[in-house]
Design a protein with these regions (language model features):
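Extended, folded cores of ATP/NTP-driven motor/assembly subunits in large transport
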Residues: 1-343
Length: 343
């Protein structure tokens, strides 16, 4: 059985990406915040700052967070550095630079550094639009879906990004507390391209020299046994596996997943896809879960057996969720994935 994969992004403009489902996502890079492993107080304060910032994304509903082990491009940087060497010591300097590259690559294979990248789905602005304008736009969207189903595609407006600039600026202001920076069009292309060059040595300048969308996906993806993927590109090949995080501790206090990932001695990408959910849709599920927990507790009491800590903590967590829903607090549903690459 063969699967036809399509690249989801149709067009980009600066840090904005228009996807084929007509949603627009804005991308930002968040600088690392240096915190020592033992500084629990600073970790707690940073988590509060991040939580407060995330609440401001509620109206946008969808967002994703990626912790990316980016190729440090050591050899490329050393080449650039060699241009600054004095003429009378160039030979020695180049020898030392080459020695440094050889030692580090021999030990680490591909030296890397971690980048935090956040993507937020933007809302289209309709300020000043009349009812007639909104009705016309709704009809156009419906017509486009019909045309897409028949294999046709609407012509894209060259200024499609103008309708999203206001919301993008609002999001950028919300991220200012974390010193976020907008991705340039070049950076956005490179981050997209890196997904198909995982753990494959390459020169960034060479990758950026061919920036057509076709060049992003020129990697051949082969599905192997055991849940592995093999990436074959003009630059080399590597193996990738995607591991969904299936179980989290009930109590999140002291749980620093991003920190644990960075402690590993091999590159692992963390990707979190999240959505602010309609709390009205989970009330039925909460009620059924509460009934199930109550029956388990009553059965344990009637049989005079000790209840497992996991069941007790789950019941406490469910009560906490019901309280938050009752107080109309924002609830996020998310999935976390680890992407491991090797050669």
């Amino acid at each position: 059985m063969s699967i036809t994969l399509t690249y989801p992004i149709r067009e980009t403009h600066e840090n904005l990406a228009l996807k084929k489902d007509q949603t627009v996502v804005a991308y930002y890079r968040i600088p690392n915040t240096p915190i020592t492993i033992t500084d629990d107080e600073k970790k707690g304060k940073h988590k509060i700052t991040v939580a407060q910032m995330m609440k401001k994304l509620q109206k946008n509903k969808f967002f994703e967070i990626s912790l990316i082990p980016k190729d440090y491009l050591l050899e490329e940087k050393m080449r650039d550095f060699s241009d600054a060497l004095a003429d009378d010591s160039r030979e020695l300097g180049e020898e030392l630079l080459l020695y440094t590259v050889d030692r580090l690559t021999d030990e680490m294979e591909i030296p890397y550094q971690f980048d935090w990248v956040v993507g937020v789905t933007l809302r289209k602005q309709n300020h000043g639009a009349t009812v007639k304008d909104l009705a016309y736009e709704s009809f156009n969207e419906f017509s486009e879906k019909i045309a897409k189903g028949l294999g046709y595609e609407y012509e894209l407006s060259p200024t499609w990004y103008e309708d999203y600039k206001s919301d993008e600026f609002t999001i950028f202001q919300a991220f200012s507390v974390l010193r976020a920076k907008r991705l340039s069009n070049e950076e956005l292309f490179y981050y997209q391209r890196m997904q198909y060059l995982r753990y494959i040595p390459h020169y960034k300048k060479e990758v950026l020299a061919n920036r057509a969308q076709f060049n992003i996906t020129d990697t051949l993806i082969k599905v192997l046994k055991g849940g592995f993927l093999k990436l074959e590109s003009p630059y080399g090949s590597s193996f990738v596996t995607i591991l969904p995080v299936g179980k989290f501790p009930v109590q999140f206090n002291g749980f620093h997943l991003g920190e644990f990932i960075q402690r590993l001695n091999f590159p692992v990408e963390l990707r979190i896809k999240a959505e602010f959910i309609d709390t009205g849709k989970i009330k039925g599920r909460m009620g059924r879960s509460n009934t199930r927990y109550r029956n388990i507790m009553e059965e344990a009491e009637n049989t005079d057996t000790v209840q497992q800590d996991e069941i007790i903590m789950g019941s406490i967590s469910l009560k906490d969720l019901m309280k938050k829903v009752g107080n109309k607090e924002d609830i996020i549903e998310y999935g976390a994935y680890l992407i491991v690459s090797a050669s």
